[in-house]
From Swiss-Prot:
Residues 1-29 form the signal peptide. Glycans are attached at N27, N83. This is Membrane protein FAM174A. The chain crosses the membrane at residues 124-144. It comes from Rattus norvegicus. Keywords: Glycoprotein, Membrane, Signal, Transmembrane, Transmembrane helix. It is a single-pass type I membrane protein. Residues 172-181 have a biased composition (Acidic residues). Belongs to the FAM174 family. Residues 37-119, 168-190 are annotated as: Disordered. It is found in: Membrane. Residues 30-123 are extracellular.
Length: 190
């Protein structure tokens, strides 16, 4: 059987996990203009360097789904802040131009304008799912290979067993009568 070159199973596993952890850092500098929302694109140009998210205000917007939070941020939230039903929301929703602009979209939502900027928990979950899938594939391949090896063993039967590993020494025979064995195969009782 030829020897395998390169890394073994755990080495491939660790290497792929390391690459997955580095991918978000490598892709952070690449920004596709089609993925950035138009409001953010018009209000300020993209600056090179690390991007950070603004802190989330306390409230129900952090737990809402993405689509629901965006629709409420554009519609009823702006109306509530102008009516004065939520204190402090008017200063948060009004931008420098006096209208609900980028700050209401970016400040109240837990959504980054750049989809490649994922939260740490989402990255960890992605890595966990990929690693679990890799482990699952490894064990499935291992099981298939073991079955192929077992089929060959069944085909040849006794000839394929390792006789070197088997002990073929004769059993010790005691001539004493206080033996506790039920029967002796060499001298069956009649």
């Amino acid at each position: 059987m030829p020897t395998r070159r390169g890394c073994s199973g755990p080495c491939h596993f660790l290497a792929s996990a390391f690459v997955l952890l580095l991918l978000p850092a490598l892709n952070q500098s690449v920004v596709l203009p089609s993925t950035v929302p138009r409001a953010v694109q018009e209000s300020k140009p993209l600056e090179p360097g690390p991007r950070t998210l603004s802190p989330l205000p306390p409230g129900p917007t952090a737990a809402q789904p993405r689509g629901q939070a965006q629709s409420e941020g554009a519609g009823p939230r702006g109306a509530e802040s102008r009516n004065g039903s939520i204190p402090g929301a008017a200063s948060e929703a009004d931008g420098p131009e006096g209208k609900a602009g980028e700050s209401s979209l970016g400040g109240s939502l837990a959504v980054s304008p750049n989809p490649s900027d994922k939260p740490m928990t989402q990255r960890a979950l992605t890595v966990l799912v990929v690693v679990s899938a890799a482990v699952l594939v490894y064990f499935v391949v291992r099981t298939v290979r073991m079955r192929r090896r077992n089929r060959k063993t069944r085909r040849y039967g006794v000839l394929d067993t390792n006789i070197e590993n088997m002990e073929l020494t004769p059993l010790e025979q005691d001539d004493e009568d206080d033996d506790n064995t039920l029967f002796d195969a060499n001298h069956p009782r009649r």
